[in-house]
């Protein structure tokens, strides 16, 4: 047992050093390994299995809303990238360039895609002629490259996996509907699959996506009180359409520009899961995305009938759940710590005494509760327990977020709150860029979003005292 305890103690306490705790967890839970290329990571099978389950949840919803998957090239000619000035200026510092093919210098540099708006626009300009071609509802699963200065696995890497949706519509109203529809899809997946509560809102002009008419976001709060932009949905209006000449003939035989949207989430969602639900023993995974939903641990497995019963339970439960049975020769205590580390939502212990009593012992990962259950009712109890774990994780995360959400009436009050008790701070804002910049300069916090559900906390801007236009969630962010 001393070894078991040491295993847990190898994780730095999140209260002592949250950053080191995060690093310890992703390494010891075998989610990633480091690469020889700075800022890149190897996503190991367990980490990738989490991403696959997130993918399935999203892809199902994309298809239910009429979207199709496509794939665009990895490379973008420099001339194509330069077509939308505001867009390229937003990404220029992060772009990786290909200058040679083999030994030959290319006549035109190729950008390794940081995002694919320009490629989709080129395709749409060639494939959309008539109103009958609309809407175009495309999504792409791929990796992108952004040459970040500071990196951390899952949260910010030079190359990362994501999905990017790109759609084209006949009217501004349809594009806006799509923008909000996909924002709601993200909120649904985050809350009902990942058990992460979100704030849905609109980004300020300063924080919006380069080239967008408007950017909407789902913001979540991590255990350390820092915000994480967990997904964005952009309304491009007809700006890209004009830059790339994407026109269609309407029902009156008149040429019109299309209206476009773009929306995406990345593998940083895995980082969010870790930082919202994890504890000092490791990962805590919501059952909906856990690669293994329950692990069966045979106790005194060398004794007659134990392994047979454990295998029988595995066969029975595998029809409904993602199940693993660990019959390795490691001690049960080591196994308990190992699967706690990996965040498996439910553990089933079965030993000789349990078999005699026709029972099993269930242990929840989220609250360590032990449940003694008759084998006759095992399947039903597992269903109900996993559902309760999923629900409890969301409730616990929401309680923490609400506890770490504050209100500030002045910049002085804001500064005191954000630097002593990190979290979301709600404050009124006049809408002026100068005040937004002042908040960043004085406190290091940024405007996370103007929530869709507004509150009138006061009628004055917390910075300048002028009439307020909107309530903003502010915070320090990853």
Curated annotation (Swiss-Prot):
Domain of life from the UniProt record: Bacteria
**Which GO molecular function terms does the record list?**
ATP binding; catalytic activity, acting on a protein; proline-tRNA ligase activity; transferase activity
Say which enzyme class the record assigns.
ligase
Q: Which reaction(s) does its UniProt entry say it catalyses?
A: tRNA(Pro) + L-proline + ATP = L-prolyl-tRNA(Pro) + AMP + diphosphate
Key words of the record = Aminoacyl-tRNA synthetase, ATP-binding, Cytoplasm, Ligase, Nucleotide-binding, Protein biosynthesis
User: Which BP terms does GO give this entry?
Assistant: prolyl-tRNA aminoacylation
Asked if the keyword Secreted belongs to this entry, the reply reads no
PROSITE patterns under this entry? Answer: AA_TRNA_LIGASE_II
Q: What is this protein called?
A: Proline--tRNA ligase
* Species for this entry: Ruminiclostridium cellulolyticum (strain ATCC 35319 / DSM 5812 / JCM 6584 / H10) (Clostridium cellulolyticum)
